[in-house]
Amino acid sequence: MEMEMEFLRKLPTPQELKEQFPVSTEVVAVKAQRDEEIRNIFEGKDDRLILVIGPCSADNEDAVIDYISRLRTVQEKVKDKIFIIPRIYTNKPRTIGVGYKGMLHQPDPEKKEDMLKGIIAIRELHTRAVKETGFTCADEMLYPENHRYLSDLLSYVAVGARSVEDQQHRLTASGVGIPVGMKNPTGGDISVMMNSMIAAQHGHTFLYRGWEVTTTGNPYAHAILRGYVDKFGRNIPNYHYEDLQNLLEHYEDVNASQQTTLANPAVIVDTNHS
Protein backbone atom coordinates (compact mmCIF):
# COMPACT_ATOMS: atom_id res chain seq x y z
CA MET A 1 0.00 0.00 0.00
CA GLU A 2 1.46 3.35 -1.06
CA MET A 3 -0.10 5.79 1.42
CA GLU A 4 -2.13 5.36 4.60
CA MET A 5 -3.56 8.84 4.13
CA GLU A 6 -6.91 10.17 2.94
CA PHE A 7 -6.76 13.40 0.95
CA LEU A 8 -9.84 15.33 2.07
CA ARG A 9 -9.70 18.49 -0.08
CA LYS A 10 -7.22 20.86 -1.66
CA LEU A 11 -6.75 24.03 0.37
CA PRO A 12 -6.26 27.51 -1.11
CA THR A 13 -2.68 28.62 -1.62
CA PRO A 14 -1.35 31.48 0.52
CA GLN A 15 -1.63 33.80 -2.49
CA GLU A 16 -5.26 32.82 -3.05
CA LEU A 17 -6.10 33.33 0.62
CA LYS A 18 -4.38 36.73 0.67
CA GLU A 19 -6.43 37.77 -2.36
CA GLN A 20 -9.62 36.58 -0.68
CA PHE A 21 -8.74 38.22 2.66
CA PRO A 22 -6.51 41.19 1.76
CA VAL A 23 -4.94 43.60 4.21
CA SER A 24 -5.49 47.34 3.96
CA THR A 25 -2.84 49.92 3.15
CA GLU A 26 -3.05 51.03 6.79
CA VAL A 27 -2.15 47.53 7.99
CA VAL A 28 0.74 47.38 5.51
CA ALA A 29 2.05 50.69 6.86
CA VAL A 30 1.77 49.58 10.50
CA LYS A 31 3.70 46.40 9.78
CA ALA A 32 6.41 48.24 7.86
CA GLN A 33 6.90 50.69 10.74
CA ARG A 34 6.99 48.03 13.44
CA ASP A 35 9.28 45.77 11.41
CA GLU A 36 11.75 48.64 11.06
CA GLU A 37 11.67 49.33 14.80
CA ILE A 38 12.28 45.66 15.57
CA ARG A 39 15.19 45.48 13.12
CA ASN A 40 16.72 48.55 14.77
CA ILE A 41 16.54 46.85 18.16
CA PHE A 42 18.24 43.70 16.88
CA GLU A 43 20.91 45.78 15.14
CA GLY A 44 21.65 47.73 18.32
CA LYS A 45 20.42 51.06 16.94
CA ASP A 46 17.61 51.12 19.51
CA ASP A 47 18.35 50.11 23.12
CA ARG A 48 14.82 49.05 24.07
CA LEU A 49 14.11 45.49 25.13
CA ILE A 50 11.72 43.28 23.18
CA LEU A 51 8.93 41.66 25.17
CA VAL A 52 6.96 38.88 23.45
CA ILE A 53 3.96 38.38 25.71
CA GLY A 54 0.68 36.51 25.62
CA PRO A 55 -1.15 33.30 26.53
CA CYS A 56 0.04 29.79 25.75
CA SER A 57 -2.38 29.52 22.84
CA ALA A 58 -5.02 31.64 21.13
CA ASP A 59 -8.31 29.76 21.10
CA ASN A 60 -10.88 32.57 21.30
CA GLU A 61 -10.67 35.56 18.98
CA ASP A 62 -12.55 38.06 21.17
CA ALA A 63 -10.54 37.13 24.27
CA VAL A 64 -7.28 37.54 22.35
CA ILE A 65 -8.25 40.98 21.06
CA ASP A 66 -9.38 42.06 24.53
CA TYR A 67 -6.05 40.94 26.01
CA ILE A 68 -3.81 42.66 23.49
CA SER A 69 -5.97 45.80 23.58
CA ARG A 70 -5.03 46.05 27.25
CA LEU A 71 -1.38 45.63 26.26
CA ARG A 72 -1.73 48.81 24.22
CA THR A 73 -2.09 50.79 27.45
CA VAL A 74 0.91 49.01 28.93
CA GLN A 75 2.96 49.75 25.82
CA GLU A 76 2.32 53.47 26.16
CA LYS A 77 3.57 53.41 29.74
CA VAL A 78 6.82 51.58 28.92
CA LYS A 79 7.42 52.71 25.34
CA ASP A 80 10.80 54.28 26.14
CA LYS A 81 12.19 51.02 27.56
CA ILE A 82 10.24 48.09 26.09
CA PHE A 83 8.87 47.17 22.67
CA ILE A 84 5.91 44.81 23.03
CA ILE A 85 5.12 42.09 20.50
CA PRO A 86 1.91 40.30 21.48
CA ARG A 87 2.08 36.54 21.27
CA ILE A 88 -0.79 35.02 19.27
CA TYR A 89 0.07 31.34 18.97
CA THR A 90 -2.46 29.70 16.66
CA ASN A 91 -0.91 26.23 16.50
CA LYS A 92 0.36 24.11 19.35
CA PRO A 93 3.03 21.40 19.35
CA ARG A 94 1.97 18.46 21.47
CA THR A 95 4.46 16.40 23.43
CA ILE A 96 2.75 13.11 22.57
CA GLY A 97 0.97 14.36 19.44
CA VAL A 98 -2.63 14.24 20.69
CA GLY A 99 -4.96 16.87 22.12
CA TYR A 100 -5.97 20.37 21.08
CA LYS A 101 -3.55 21.54 18.39
CA GLY A 102 -4.64 25.15 18.19
CA MET A 103 -6.90 27.42 16.19
CA LEU A 104 -5.31 26.40 12.90
CA HIS A 105 -6.58 22.85 13.36
CA GLN A 106 -9.71 23.58 15.35
CA PRO A 107 -11.00 27.17 15.14
CA ASP A 108 -13.81 26.25 17.52
CA PRO A 109 -12.46 24.05 20.36
CA GLU A 110 -15.94 22.60 20.82
CA LYS A 111 -16.23 21.40 17.22
CA LYS A 112 -14.30 19.00 15.01
CA GLU A 113 -11.06 19.89 13.25
CA ASP A 114 -11.40 21.95 10.06
CA MET A 115 -8.17 23.16 8.48
CA LEU A 116 -9.87 25.35 5.86
CA LYS A 117 -11.78 27.26 8.51
CA GLY A 118 -8.58 27.25 10.55
CA ILE A 119 -6.36 29.03 8.02
CA ILE A 120 -9.10 31.60 7.49
CA ALA A 121 -9.61 32.06 11.24
CA ILE A 122 -5.93 32.65 12.01
CA ARG A 123 -5.58 35.13 9.16
CA GLU A 124 -8.66 37.05 10.29
CA LEU A 125 -7.44 37.04 13.90
CA HIS A 126 -4.02 38.46 13.07
CA THR A 127 -5.59 41.02 10.71
CA ARG A 128 -8.03 42.14 13.38
CA ALA A 129 -5.19 42.45 15.89
CA VAL A 130 -3.34 44.93 13.70
CA LYS A 131 -6.44 46.90 12.73
CA GLU A 132 -7.87 47.22 16.24
CA THR A 133 -4.73 47.54 18.37
CA GLY A 134 -1.90 48.66 16.09
CA PHE A 135 0.11 45.59 17.11
CA THR A 136 1.68 43.22 14.64
CA CYS A 137 2.22 40.01 16.53
CA ALA A 138 4.26 36.84 16.99
CA ASP A 139 3.29 33.28 16.15
CA GLU A 140 5.09 29.95 16.25
CA MET A 141 6.34 28.55 12.95
CA LEU A 142 5.15 25.06 13.74
CA TYR A 143 4.46 24.20 10.09
CA PRO A 144 6.98 25.94 7.80
CA GLU A 145 4.78 25.51 4.71
CA ASN A 146 2.00 27.53 6.37
CA HIS A 147 4.07 30.63 7.13
CA ARG A 148 3.03 32.47 3.98
CA TYR A 149 -0.62 32.45 5.03
CA LEU A 150 0.43 35.08 7.61
CA SER A 151 3.68 36.47 6.18
CA ASP A 152 2.14 39.90 5.48
CA LEU A 153 0.88 40.21 9.06
CA LEU A 154 3.53 38.83 11.43
CA SER A 155 6.52 40.70 12.84
CA TYR A 156 8.13 37.80 14.71
CA VAL A 157 8.13 34.00 14.65
CA ALA A 158 9.61 31.36 16.91
CA VAL A 159 10.84 27.88 16.07
CA GLY A 160 10.02 25.66 19.02
CA ALA A 161 12.16 23.29 21.02
CA ARG A 162 10.74 20.24 19.26
CA SER A 163 11.27 21.72 15.78
CA VAL A 164 14.65 23.41 16.05
CA GLU A 165 16.62 20.43 14.71
CA ASP A 166 14.37 20.02 11.67
CA GLN A 167 15.97 21.00 8.37
CA GLN A 168 12.80 22.40 6.78
CA HIS A 169 12.30 24.76 9.72
CA ARG A 170 15.89 25.95 9.51
CA LEU A 171 15.82 26.48 5.75
CA THR A 172 12.45 28.23 5.79
CA ALA A 173 13.67 30.51 8.59
CA SER A 174 16.49 31.58 6.28
CA GLY A 175 13.94 33.06 3.89
CA VAL A 176 11.42 34.88 6.08
CA GLY A 177 11.81 38.63 6.27
CA ILE A 178 11.36 39.00 10.03
CA PRO A 179 13.28 37.91 13.14
CA VAL A 180 13.10 34.21 13.91
CA GLY A 181 13.82 32.99 17.43
CA MET A 182 15.38 29.53 17.70
CA LYS A 183 14.80 27.69 20.98
CA ASN A 184 17.17 25.26 22.60
CA PRO A 185 15.69 21.74 22.43
CA THR A 186 13.78 20.14 25.29
CA GLY A 187 16.98 18.34 26.34
CA GLY A 188 18.78 21.68 26.75
CA ASP A 189 21.66 21.27 24.26
CA ILE A 190 22.70 24.84 23.40
CA SER A 191 24.82 23.67 20.46
CA VAL A 192 21.70 22.45 18.65
CA MET A 193 20.19 25.93 18.89
CA MET A 194 23.44 27.53 17.72
CA ASN A 195 23.59 25.23 14.70
CA SER A 196 20.00 26.14 13.88
CA MET A 197 20.83 29.86 13.98
CA ILE A 198 23.85 29.34 11.73
CA ALA A 199 21.70 27.48 9.22
CA ALA A 200 19.00 30.16 9.30
CA GLN A 201 21.48 32.99 8.79
CA HIS A 202 22.85 31.39 5.61
CA GLY A 203 21.25 31.17 2.18
CA HIS A 204 19.94 27.88 0.80
CA THR A 205 18.24 26.28 -2.19
CA PHE A 206 15.46 23.85 -1.31
CA LEU A 207 11.90 22.68 -1.97
CA TYR A 208 9.09 24.81 -0.56
CA ARG A 209 5.39 24.41 -1.32
CA GLY A 210 6.07 22.67 -4.62
CA TRP A 211 8.71 25.19 -5.75
CA GLU A 212 12.47 25.18 -5.95
CA VAL A 213 13.39 28.30 -3.97
CA THR A 214 16.54 30.11 -2.96
CA THR A 215 17.14 32.32 0.07
CA THR A 216 19.81 34.80 1.11
CA GLY A 217 19.78 34.04 4.84
CA ASN A 218 18.11 35.75 7.78
CA PRO A 219 20.47 38.02 9.76
CA TYR A 220 17.88 38.31 12.53
CA ALA A 221 17.79 34.62 13.49
CA HIS A 222 18.62 34.54 17.19
CA ALA A 223 18.49 32.50 20.40
CA ILE A 224 15.55 31.81 22.67
CA LEU A 225 16.61 30.24 25.96
CA ARG A 226 14.03 27.91 27.49
CA GLY A 227 14.22 25.71 30.52
CA TYR A 228 14.60 21.99 29.95
CA VAL A 229 14.46 18.59 31.60
CA ASP A 230 17.76 16.72 31.87
CA LYS A 231 18.24 12.96 31.47
CA PHE A 232 17.55 12.45 35.18
CA GLY A 233 14.16 14.18 34.95
CA ARG A 234 15.32 17.33 36.71
CA ASN A 235 13.93 20.69 35.63
CA ILE A 236 16.80 23.02 34.71
CA PRO A 237 16.10 26.79 34.55
CA ASN A 238 17.27 29.12 31.80
CA TYR A 239 17.34 32.60 33.28
CA HIS A 240 20.35 32.80 35.59
CA TYR A 241 23.35 34.99 34.85
CA GLU A 242 25.40 31.85 34.22
CA ASP A 243 22.97 30.72 31.51
CA LEU A 244 23.29 34.02 29.68
CA GLN A 245 27.07 34.00 30.09
CA ASN A 246 27.20 30.48 28.67
CA LEU A 247 25.18 31.58 25.64
CA LEU A 248 27.46 34.58 25.12
CA GLU A 249 30.45 32.25 25.09
CA HIS A 250 28.75 30.09 22.47
CA TYR A 251 28.18 33.17 20.30
CA GLU A 252 31.83 34.16 20.71
CA ASP A 253 33.03 30.65 19.86
CA VAL A 254 31.01 30.63 16.64
CA ASN A 255 32.24 34.06 15.58
CA ALA A 256 35.85 33.13 16.37
CA SER A 257 35.75 29.89 14.40
CA GLN A 258 36.57 31.53 11.02
CA GLN A 259 34.06 29.16 9.41
CA THR A 260 31.08 31.44 9.92
CA THR A 261 29.78 34.39 11.91
CA LEU A 262 26.42 35.17 13.45
CA ALA A 263 25.02 38.63 12.79
CA ASN A 264 23.11 40.63 15.40
CA PRO A 265 23.69 38.33 18.40
CA ALA A 266 20.65 38.45 20.67
CA VAL A 267 18.70 36.39 23.15
CA ILE A 268 15.13 36.22 24.35
CA VAL A 269 14.45 34.35 27.59
CA ASP A 270 11.35 32.16 27.41
CA THR A 271 9.80 32.63 30.84
CA ASN A 272 6.87 30.37 29.90
CA HIS A 273 9.35 27.49 30.06
CA SER A 274 11.82 28.84 32.60
Roles of regions detected by a PLM:
Residues 50, 83, 266:
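Hydrophobic "anchor" residues on beta-strands that sit immediately upstream
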Residues 247, 263-267:
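Active-site/ligand-binding-proximal alpha/beta "capping" segment
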Residues 1-45:
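N- or domain-start disorder-to-order transition segments that initiate the globular core
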Residues 54, 269:
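Conserved, mostly hydrophobic/aromatic
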Residues 55-62:
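Short, glycine-rich nucleotide/cofactor-binding loops
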Residues 39-47, 256-264:
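Glycine-rich phosphate/diphosphate-binding loops that line cofactor/substrate pockets in enzymes
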Residues 2, 68, 81-250, 257, ...:
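Active-site-facing alpha/beta catalytic cores
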